[in-house]
């Protein structure tokens, strides 16, 4: 039986681990990030992958830094035939990458060489792509730069969010891995080098990227909101207060107004001018310190005026 070590951390990784178990591989160990404090009460919380591994009685390693010798030697001591990673969250050292008989492969949520990095799902939507996919490739120390083994395309729908696409790609990754590993073990795959001229990056989202830039086109603002839903969530400011924008709709704007200005207030939301003739009607938001709510709920208690400018004093 093929001995596999799995390395992964978030919910995205769980179906991949589950599929390895269902397919009958001997998952001899799981490597995941340390437990972290979560929420306002800072409750120490295990990763989704750790929770899944413990359901199946699989030993779990949680290195703070996998590149440290005493940590990677614990992985090597397991003597895996194959290592599979999916959103592990740390750079894996060569000592691990070179050890398994069948190598170390990664399940990545983009059609490499596009969108290397830790936030490919967010960027696929924020950039307005109509398709993305899963790539399974050999791991190298350079970020997501290994030779490609298999790929599958996944359509991005008009109203797709990062949350819904995350779920689709997670399942697609598990399914593709199930088909890829047997071919890899049988030596039936021809690795393909990535074209370095086509490389783009999707680095982890920073706080300053979350703010809506109303001077962009309506389509770009709409994609920005979708791409940051349900985390970390796009935001703007209204009357100097931070407001998270959970959802909005593209609408035509007939009157010219400065980008970021409220040009209409309707029962289910307010329309904001952008950098072109497509406005965005904000329909779901979350004022600072309050719960997420529909814009119609918000408007029952707060009455912004037409002409109010969003995005100032952030």
UniProtKB/Swiss-Prot annotation:
Residue sites binding (6S)-5,6,7,8-tetrahydrofolate per the record: 110-113
A GO CC term assigned to this protein in UniProt: cytosol
Entry keyword Protein biosynthesis: yes
PROSITE patterns for this protein: GART (PS00373)
Pfam assignment, any one: Formyl_trans_C
SUPFAM superfamilies (alphabetical): FMT C-terminal domain-like, Formyltransferase
Keywords of this entry: Protein biosynthesis, Transferase
Listed InterPro entries: Fmt (IPR005794), Formyl_trans_C (IPR005793), Formyl_trans_C_sf (IPR037022), Formyl_transf_N (IPR002376), Formyl_transf_N_sf (IPR036477), Formyl_transferase-like_C_sf (IPR011034), GART_AS (IPR001555), Met-tRNA-FMT_C (IPR044135)
Record's catalysed reaction(s): L-methionyl-tRNA(fMet) + (6R)-10-formyltetrahydrofolate = N-formyl-L-methionyl-tRNA(fMet) + (6S)-5,6,7,8-tetrahydrofolate + H(+)
Family membership noted in the UniProt record: Belongs to the Fmt family.
This protein's name: Methionyl-tRNA formyltransferase
Species assigned in the record: Bacillus cereus (strain AH187)
């Amino acid at each position: 039986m093929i001995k596999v070590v799995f390395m992964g951390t978030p919910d995205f990784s769980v179906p991949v681990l589950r599929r390895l178990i269902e397919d009958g591989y001997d998952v001899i160990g799981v490597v995941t990030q340390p437990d972290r404090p979560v929420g306002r009460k800072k409750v120490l919380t295990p990763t989704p992958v750790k929770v899944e591994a413990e359901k199946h009685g699989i030993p779990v390693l949680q290195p703070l830094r996998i590149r440290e010798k005493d940590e990677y030697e614990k992985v090597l001591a397991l003597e895996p035939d194959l290592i599979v990673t999916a959103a592990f969250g740390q750079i894996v050292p060569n000592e691990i990458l070179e050890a398994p008989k069948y190598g170390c492969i990664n399940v990545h949520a983009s059609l490499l060489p596009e969108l290397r990095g830790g936030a490919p799902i967010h960027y696929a939507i924020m950039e307005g792509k109509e398709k993305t996919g899963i790539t399974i490739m050999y791991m190298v120390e350079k970020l997501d730069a290994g030779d490609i083994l298999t790929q599958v395309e996944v359509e991005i729908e008009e109203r797709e969010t990062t949350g819904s696409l995350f779920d689709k790609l997670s399942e697609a990754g598990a399914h593709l891995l199930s088909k890829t590993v047997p071919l890899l073990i049988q030596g039936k795959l021809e690795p393909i080098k990535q074209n370095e001229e086509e490389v783009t990056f999707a680095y982890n989202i920073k706080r300053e990227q979350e703010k809506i830039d109303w001077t962009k086109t309506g389509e770009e603002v709409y994609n920005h909101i979708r791409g940051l839903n349900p985390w970390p969530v796009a935001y703007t400011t209204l009357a100097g207060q931070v407001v998270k924008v959970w959802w909005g709709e593209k609408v035509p704007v007939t009157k010219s107004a400065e980008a970021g200005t409220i040009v209409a207030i309707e029962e289910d939301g307010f329309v904001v001018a952008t950098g072109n003739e497509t406005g965005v009607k904000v329909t779901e938001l979350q004022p600072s310190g309050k719960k997420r709510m529909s814009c119609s709920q918000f408007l029952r208690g707060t009455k912004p005026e037409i002409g109010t400018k969003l995005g100032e004093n952030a």
